[in-house]
A protein has these predicted regions:
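Extracytoplasmic copper-binding redox domains, predominantly the cupredoxin/blue-copper superfamily
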Residues: 20-148
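Positively charged n-region of N-terminal signal peptides that target proteins for export
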Residues: 1-5
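Bacterial N-terminal signal peptides
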Residues: 6-15
Length: 148
């Protein structure tokens, strides 16, 4: 009987934990309030367990990870297709559109604490040298990350 109570508690706890996870949408656009070739929003503060849904607002875009926390899964979406990315590890995730990265079509996700912020800052600095349009977009998005 004691074990049954423990099992029931675990089931209820897991159900509550799952119900707290959110689906957050990011649009892939030619033009947005952020300017040309942009993800909207370009910065997302999420929780571990949340799912980011990248949806095409215009043709010719995808979402691909550039940096993920240790142990997290990389992703590479197909062009013109929705992709769902579940945030299973705490930290900073950097992403871009493969076709428009040099135009500053980049973004940042913070899931929980920014445990890999130093690594993310270094990667953004490296990538900024390759961007010729919307040069400050990556740095502005990363500046919204709250320190661990």
């Amino acid at each position: 009987m004691k074990h049954l109570g423990t099992i029931l508690f675990a089931i209820i706890f897991l159900s509550i934990a799952r119900s707290n996870a959110a689906d957050l949408q990011v649009k892939m656009l030619d033009n947005s309030k952020e300017g040309t070739m942009a993800f909207e929003p370009g910065f997302i503060k999420a929780g571990v367990g949340d799912t980011i849904i990248f949806t095409p607002g215009n043709k010719g875009h995808n979402s691909a990870s550039m940096l993920v926390p240790t142990g997290a899964k990389q992703w590479k979406g197909e062009f013109d297709k929705e992709i769902r990315v579940k945030l299973e590890k705490e930290g900073v995730y950097l992403f871009a559109c493969d076709a428009h990265k040099v135009m500053g079509m980049v973004g940042v996700i913070q899931a929980g604490k920014a445990v890999n912020l130093a690594e993310a800052k270094k990667k953004v600095e490296e990538e900024n040298a390759k961007i010729f349009l919307n040069k400050d977009r990556f740095s502005k998005a990363l500046a919204q990350v709250t320190k661990p």
